[in-house]
Swiss-Prot record:
Family per record: Belongs to the squalene monooxygenase family.
Associated pathway: Terpene metabolism; lanosterol biosynthesis; lanosterol from farnesyl diphosphate: step 2/3
Gene label: ERG1
One GO MF term attached to the UniProt entry: squalene monooxygenase activity
Spans through the membrane: 10-30, 426-446, 464-484
The protein's name: Squalene monooxygenase
Protein's organism: Candida glabrata (strain ATCC 2001 / BCRC 20586 / JCM 3761 / NBRC 0622 / NRRL Y-65 / CBS 138) (Yeast)
Record carries keyword Ribosomal protein: no
Main subcellular location of this protein, as a coarse class: membrane
Annotated keywords: Endoplasmic reticulum, FAD, Flavoprotein, Membrane, Microsome, Oxidoreductase, Transmembrane, Transmembrane helix
Enzyme nomenclature, EC number: 1.14.14.17
Length: 489
């Protein structure tokens, strides 16, 4: 089917700008609800990107709700059953939560059918393991292959029309309400396409997020440098690895296929060093676990570095009639916790529950529901987003108090029980309780203060009390402003 023949004489129910992870999910869900959908993407060929390679259990649960879980099949996706956190040579294993402790996965009417909420059997994803494991699972995957699967599921829907072109303008009427988009299409030029509701899903580098507000732009304070490791010997199979220490920035390692492992090395500035190889050799290589060193050293010698900026962007209300901004175009968090796709996919689930059965030509009714949607999404959105930025502050500790909190956090994990069960449930995107997150974060802070007092001893108590006050103030600074912004903004 041609990707340039979309009919501009039709008023579509929904026009979707962008076919990254979120766009095809919105398009598929709305099409299954009977909506006539046009989805526009600049380039439909498989991309090569290092974002969106780790899907937390909360994201997989959302794919099940949408009837799109089979998008992880037949792409050599690699199961993830939990995390291993390293700190100055010690480590602690943190498995994902038990399924019995969570609510059953919600099956959205009209979307889940014919077993499309269950994984298929393939070379790396074993149906029995995913469906019958007593614990939740995540998955590491090659982003481009996953995206192709999502796009193919979307393309199979008869109510979806795909268009390859560059969206150059969001169209508005005399009342300043959004009525569609102008698309530059090969061999056709600039064409106006009309729709009752236009979805902006154009991702991290969104051109159109500022249609909500001119100030809706992300903040960038840090970076990651990525490399591909091949045939790496992971310290713990089927685990994501977080490598911490008081002398280096956080290092993330997770397998994305049987052959390929992604390593992401944090750098605490918006722009990475000019001489990346020297920086990696000096500030990263000495802290890589022994089993990973051969594959790391090979990758370092090849010098194929992939830098990426880390953005933070709190969500704004979708208060423009005829417009819905969703995914990374709306809301971003630090990628340390791998929660981006989880938030975006849960947004799609909630969105479909709110507006999937509405008549989109009733634009005021749709707008009312979108305003409600903004507030209903805050619980899970706030947990994943605030956790990402506060954990990064601790794990990338650049002050005495933050280093104390970093050590205290690791020691807290070592206690086991709820000291790991609750944090990993937040990380997995399956415990949308921001007040409980607050309690756990400050439990870590007070445990850090206790450890410091114990280390100081009786004679050092006055100094320990002063340091405790400073540690508590630091904890408040790295957590509270972000929580308030997410919940109240």
């Amino acid at each position: 089917m041609s990707l340039t023949n979309a009919d501009e004489t039709v008023t579509y129910d929904a026009l979707i700008v962008g076919a990254g992870v979120i766009g095809p999910c919105v398009a598929t869900a709305l099409a299954r609800k009977g909506k006539k959908v046009l989805i526009v993407e600049r380039e439909w060929s498989q991309p090569d990107r290092i974002v969106g390679e780790l899907m937390q259990p909360g994201g997989l649960r959302a794919l099940r709700s949408l009837g799109m879980i089979q998008s992880i099949n037949n792409i050599d996706a690699y199961p993830v059953t939990g995390y291993t956190v390293f700190y100055n040579g010690e480590h602690v294993d943190i498995p994902y939560p038990y399924k019995a402790d969570l609510k059953p996965v919600e099956k959205l009417p009209g979307l889940v059918r014919d077993g499309n909420d269950k994984v298929l059997e393939d070379a790396t994803v074993h149906k029995k393991d995913f469906e019958d494991d007593e614990r939740e699972r995540g998955v590491g995957l090659v982003h481009g292959r996953f995206l192709n699967n999502l796009r193919n599921i979307c393309a199979a829907e008869p109510n979806v029309t795909r268009l390859q072109g560059n969206v150059v303008e969001i169209l508005k009427d005399k009342k300043n309400e959004v009525v569609g988009a102008k698309v530059d299409v090969d061999s056709r030029g600039k064409v106006d396409f009309k729709a009752h509701l236009t979805f902006v899903c154009d991702g991290i580098f969104s051109r159109f997020r500022r249609e909500l507000h001119p100030d809706h732009v992300p903040t960038v304070n840090s970076s990651f440098v990525g490399m591909s490791l091949y045939h790496a010997h992971m310290p713990h199979d089927m685990h994501g690895h977080v490598i911490l220490g008081d002398k280096h920035m956080p290092i993330l390692v997770y397998q994305i296929s049987p052959e390929e492992t992604r390593i992401l090395c944090a750098y605490n500035a918006p722009k990475v060093p000019t001489d990346l190889k020297s920086w990696m050799t000096k500030d990263v290589q000495p802290y890589i676990p022994k089993t990973l060193r051969p594959s790391f050293d090979d990758a370092l010698a090849q010098g194929k570095f992939k830098p990426m900026a880390n953005s933070w962007l709190p969500a704004r209300q979708n208060d423009v009639t005829g417009l819905c901004v969703i995914g990374d175009a709306l809301n971003m968090r630090h990628p340390l916790t791998g929660g981006g796709m989880t938030v975006g996919l849960n947004d799609v689930v909630l969105l479909i529950k709110k507006i999937g059965d509405l008549d989109f030509s009733d634009r005021e009714k749709v707008l009312d529901e979108l305003l409600d949607y903004h507030f209903e999404r805050k619980n899970y959105d706030a947990v994943v987003n605030v956790l990402s930025i506060s954990l990064y502050s601790l794990f990338a500790a650049d002050s005495k108090n933050l280093k104390a909190l970093q050590k205290g956090c690791f020691k807290y994990f070592q206690r086991g029980g709820d000291c790991v069960n609750l944090p990993v449930a937040f990380l997995a995107g399956v415990l949308p309780k921001p007040l409980l997150l607050t309690r756990v974060f400050f439990a870590v802070a007070f445990y850090t203060i206790y450890l410091n007092m114990e280390e100081r001893g009786f004679l050092g108590l006055p100094m320990a009390l002063l340091e405790g006050i400073m540690i508590l103030i630091t904890a408040i600074k790295v957590f509270t402003p972000f929580l308030v912004r997410e919940l109240i903004g």
